[in-house]
Amino acid sequence: MNRQLVNILTALFAFFLETNHFRTAFCKDHDSRSGKQPSQTLSPSDFLDKLMGRTSGYDARIRPNFKGPPVNVTCNIFINSFGSVTETTMDYRVNIFLRQQWNDSRLAYSEYPDDSLDLDPSMLDSIWKPDLFFANEKGANFHDVTTDNKLLRISKNGKVLYSIRLTLTLSCPMDLKNFPMDVQTCTMQLESFGYTMNDLIFEWLSDGPVQVAEGLTLPQFILKEEKELGYCTKHYNTGKFTCIEVKFHLERQMGYYLIQMYIPSLLIVILSWVSFWINMDAAPARVALGITTVLTMTTQSSGSRASLPKVSYVKAIDIWMAVCLLFVFAALLEYAAVNFVSRQHKEFLRLRRRQKRQNKEEDVTRESRFNFSGYGMGHCLQVKDGTAVKATPANPLPQPPKDGDAIKKKFVDRAKRIDTISRAAFPLAFLIFNIFYWITYKIIRHEDVHKK
């Protein structure tokens, strides 16, 4: 009885398995006929391998639209810091986010639910990238603290966003004729290195191509809000290459130079005028003051040129320093003239004494030749008829000179008059120079620069 029961249960179990297998096969056949596929969800790793891995067929060495129209790459930059504008080397340093966007249809996807993928920077080696470089770059640094400062984002439609943080040292040829009241224009040029315009074209992003961090300030310059965007297509022997540029206008703030150069030199010039009020007999004081101001002005002039390049043209600060040195030197020469005039009375009296001595010698000589007093005839001249007449002097003796004190007073008054005139003439001349100087450089030339 038990044996029969076991056989019955075994037969029922086999029937159940056969029925279940038939049902599964029927469902698969029905699904295949109706076109339905079993649902499968790819893992992120499998999806990336399928999108740009070895099995995807994607080749990073070939640009999008190969043998077709050029790839349009839109660029924009965000300026984090702007500074270290150096006149001696004529360059500036800037820290930026460089963002490039282009479309690569080979990276379009629909199997993954997200609209965009933010990928690790290491994936940059697996995709094609534009060969952008900065044409006027003198030095550059990447940033990798705490990790590589790079961003890679791929959208469903194949749009690629590549962002990178850079610190650049860019050349900036400067015109220093109006220094330190100048406005400099510094450029940043983005160019393709290997792809010609048949393969690659750079364009500025239409919305916010150049952005500046809020509150960005420079030590000596004001960064103007107006930024000129344009194209700078380069023509070489190897072809025509795409290039875009942005021009930054930097207006120098002259507060530093006003305190360090203009005001000290102005005070030195005014100090040199103090000698006009010092007594002309105090030669050591006036000479020491004059020489000290000249040497100080020379040192000040040399210091103003220490931080500037050796250019062939004259700068505004050079004219100021040269004129200040000229006024200080003229004040020293003024005392030399005063001292010379005040001592002229001694030379005048010496010449008068010499003239008087010569006249006396001539009289003595004349008397020795025609003196007949020994014969009782006195000063006589012999004429043809043998008679003698009394001789009269040919040149009468000069009038006695004026009193020496009066002559001295006359020349001293002349010297004092020079000091008196200088007290008004020097400040007036310097004031006129200042009017012309500041009008020329601060108003006229400043407006000309802005028009350009």
From Swiss-Prot:
Self-association state and partner proteins as the record states: Interacts with GLRB. Heteropentamer composed of GLRA2 and GLRB. Functional GLRB-GLRA2 heteropentamers contain four GLRA2 subunits and one GLRB subunit, although alternative subunit composition cannot be excluded. Homopentamer (in vitro). Both homopentamers and heteropentamers form functional ion channels, but their characteristics are subtly different.
Pfam families assigned to the protein according to its UniProt record, in alphabetical order: Neur_chan_LBD (PF02931), Neur_chan_memb (PF02932)
Molecular function GO terms recorded: extracellularly glycine-gated chloride channel activity; glycine binding; glycine-gated chloride ion channel activity; metal ion binding; transmembrane signaling receptor activity; transmitter-gated monoatomic ion channel activity involved in regulation of postsynaptic membrane potential
Gene Ontology CC terms: cell projection; chloride channel complex; GABA-ergic synapse; glycinergic synapse; intracellular membrane-bounded organelle; plasma membrane; postsynaptic specialization membrane
Protein name: Glycine receptor subunit alpha-2
Disease: Intellectual developmental disorder, X-linked, syndromic, Pilorge type: A disorder characterized by global developmental delay with variably impaired intellectual development, speech delay, and behavioral abnormalities. Variable features include motor incoordination, seizures, and ocular abnormalities. Disease onset is in infancy, and severity is higly variable.
Keyword annotations from UniProtKB, A to Z: Cell membrane, Cell projection, Chloride, Chloride channel, Disease variant, Disulfide bond, Glycoprotein, Intellectual disability, Ion channel, Ion transport, Ligand-gated ion channel, Membrane, Metal-binding, Postsynaptic cell membrane, Receptor, Signal, Synapse, Transmembrane, Transmembrane helix, Transport, Zinc
Effect noted on mutating residue 153 to Q: In MRXSP; fails to rescue abnormal outgrowth of spinal motor neuron axons in zebrafish morphants; mutant channels show severely decreased sensitivity to glycine and are unable to respond to physiological glycine levels; results in reduced protein expression; reduced localization to the cell membrane
Membrane side Cytoplasmic: residue ranges: 279-283, 337-420
Topology versus the membrane: Multi-pass membrane protein
InterPro entries assigned: GABAA/Glycine_rcpt (IPR006028), Glycine_rcpt_A (IPR008127), Glycine_rcpt_A2 (IPR008129), Neur_chan_lig-bd (IPR006202), Neur_chan_lig-bd_sf (IPR036734), Neur_channel (IPR006201), Neuro-gated_channel_TM_sf (IPR036719), Neuro_actylchol_rec (IPR038050)
Organism, scientific name: Homo sapiens (Human)
Annotated TM spans: 257-278, 284-304, 316-336, 421-441
Location (main, coarse): membrane
